[in-house]
Amino acid sequence: MLAFCRSSLKSKKYFIILLALAAIAGLGTHAAWSSNGLPRIDNKTLARLAQQHPVVVLFRHAERCDRSTNQCLSDKTGITVKGTQDARELGNAFSADIPDFDLYSSNTVRTIQSATWFSAGKKLTVDKRLLQCGNEIYSAIKDLQSKAPDKNIVIFTHNHCLTYIAKDKRDATFKPDYLDGLVMHVEKGKVYLDGEFVNH
């Protein structure tokens, strides 16, 4: 019982820190909460959160070639040239505040290409489990985090995965655009959704 209370207090303390950081971020972004009810977490706020817990950031892949009139990078099942530019820009901004992270993607061309352009040379691990978007994705996240408990993790996955997580964890309706993301962390074997990543 005592252990449970301590764990509960720790989780509440972390959530209070998150709220405070989101409020601070809101002073600069004009809104600490998204219209869907998720806390907005920008790069600076994410860096502060990473000092409390290693973070897990899940991104939707960049612009799909087969659903755009923009020029394809190569394979039609991959992303567009614009998508590569957007992914590189996001990666540069992200790495400026979170330089140390392990990088993963699902086993599709579009997520692999997105992660590759995001990372600018960082080692990428492809994991087919990250294509499955039910409770299975939580098991995959916990497994990846357990391999390097002190490392931040970036995962490139799919819109339906992010939509599922937001609904399941916070009953929020989240319809991610290309390269939108969610911020999570793992604590004592449980996966928590902290908020929506906002790139500023």
Curated annotation (Swiss-Prot):
One of its GO terms (biological process) is lipopolysaccharide metabolic process. It is found in: Periplasm. Pathway: Bacterial outer membrane biogenesis; lipopolysaccharide metabolism. GO terms for cellular component: periplasmic space. SUPFAM superfamilies: Phosphoglycerate mutase-like. Keywords: Hydrolase, Periplasm, Signal. Residues 1-25 form the signal peptide. The keyword Phosphoprotein does not apply. Its EC number is 3.1.3.-. InterPro entries: His_Pase_superF_clade-1, His_PPase_superfam, LipoPS_heptP_Pase. One of its GO terms (molecular function) is phosphatase activity. Gene3D superfamilies: Phosphoglycerate mutase-like (3.40.50.1240). HAMAP family: Ais. Catalyzes the dephosphorylation of heptose(II) of the outer membrane lipopolysaccharide core. Belongs to the phosphoglycerate mutase family. Ais subfamily. This is Lipopolysaccharide core heptose(II)-phosphate phosphatase. It comes from Escherichia coli (strain SMS-3-5 / SECEC). The gene is ais.
